[in-house]
């Protein structure tokens, strides 16, 4: 039986795993500094796995942790929860050098918007897209 999160399988690509673990392009320039998704070290990814309830992690490359997290989230029907965790503002420690909190919030929102655009570009041929609506992430048919 297909689950509500089966559409997230379209994200099962190494390119997306690497992007989500912080090995992607800078997405926003603010006052001459460039920002993207947080860069997660292996130990941080391991901690994220534990926090999310995934206790048996094989490890290896950093992208493998993200792959296992996504597989687990799809299996457990918790993809929205996973993406809210990965995109939580508290994860963006790379923004801590911005002094003004309003600017931090603005840069954070811009990064999330650009990150979704980046992911959607990567999956565009599937005719599906990642959207963030009313505080929740979901995969929908393009234009719906």
Regions found by a protein language model. Give the residues of each.
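Conserved N-terminal substructure of TIR/SEFIR domains
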Residues: 143-144
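Charged interaction/catalytic cores of defense and host-pathogen modules
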Residues: 1-139
